[in-house]
Amino acid sequence: MGCSSSTERLTSTKNINIVTSPAQQQKKNAQDTKVKIVLLGDSGVGKSSIALYLCHGRFSEKHQVTIGAAFLHHNIELKNGATMKLHIWDTGGQERFRSMAPLYYRDAYGAVVVYDSNNVESFDSLKYWINEIKSNGPRNCCIMVVANKKDLPQKLNSEMVMKFCEQENVSFIECSAKTGENITTLFEKLASRIYSRFKEVLYYNNP
């Protein structure tokens, strides 16, 4: 009798709609969010080394010139617990590859502009690279200037660089692709800014 009674109380759940809160829905949407990031800067400043350390946790002393662009991907967990999938395009910085760079700016939500903190010429090129992404990239692209090789004696004054970045309205961080200092932090900060600035667009483009 007990068995019969419990059977009569069973109901089908296939037509039941599960209601989630706005916060839960945002987290679900953000978990499937994919964003494109471009790495820019002169040849030899350490763009590939930064990407290598982020994605594989290692550093290589061998310098290999990036021809055109290299593609990597990495997941970043945001403060709200959601995951953002970064599609990272590491562009070649040599003069002969510069004409190809704008091809990779399209649809980029973020740009990491790298210079060598021990190379004044690479700092002088920052203006060129920032103008490149502002002129040829998407509107309101999140730009972060990165001083690489922090593990070496510094030839450039950080305060001067910070002032330059304030004038350009871009973010700034120092890092070392050799020791790994601030590598993850810089991409976490960039991902957070992209999420804050573009979350409505990202949800629309990543249903």
From Swiss-Prot:
Quaternary organization: Interacts with CK1. May interact with ARF1.
Keyword Hydrolase carried by entry: yes
GO cellular component: autophagosome membrane; early endosome; endomembrane system; food vacuole; plasma membrane
Gene from which this protein is expressed: RAB5b
Role this protein plays: Small GTPase which regulates vesicle trafficking between organelles. May be involved in the trafficking of the N-myristoylated AK2 from the endoplasmic reticulum to the parasitophorous vacuole membrane.
Principal cellular location given in the protein's record: membrane
Residue positions bearing lipid (N-myristoyl glycine): 2
Location relative to the cell: Cell membrane; Vacuole membrane; Vesicle
CDD domains reported for this sequence: Rab (cd00154)
Family in the record: Belongs to the small GTPase superfamily. Rab family.
Chemical reaction(s) catalysed: GTP + H2O = GDP + phosphate + H(+)
Membrane-spanning intervals of the chain: none
Sites where the protein binds GTP: 41-49, 60-66, 90-94, 148-151, 176-178
Entry protein name: Ras-related protein Rab-5B
Motif interval(s): Effector region: 63-71
Enzyme class, broadest EC rank: hydrolase
Cited InterPro entries: P-loop_NTPase (IPR027417), Sigma_54_int_dom_ATP-bd_1 (IPR025662), Small_GTP-bd (IPR005225), Small_GTPase (IPR001806)
Membrane-protein topology: Lipid-anchor
Protein EC: 3.6.5.2
Regulation: Alternates between an inactive GDP-bound form and an active GTP-bound form. Activated by guanine nucleotide-exchange factors (GEFs) and inactivated by GTPase-activating proteins (GAPs).
Post-translational modification: Myristoylation is required for cell membrane and food vacuole membrane localization. May be palmitoylated on Cys-3.
GO biological process: intracellular protein transport
Keyword GTP-binding: yes
Single GO MF descriptor: GTP binding
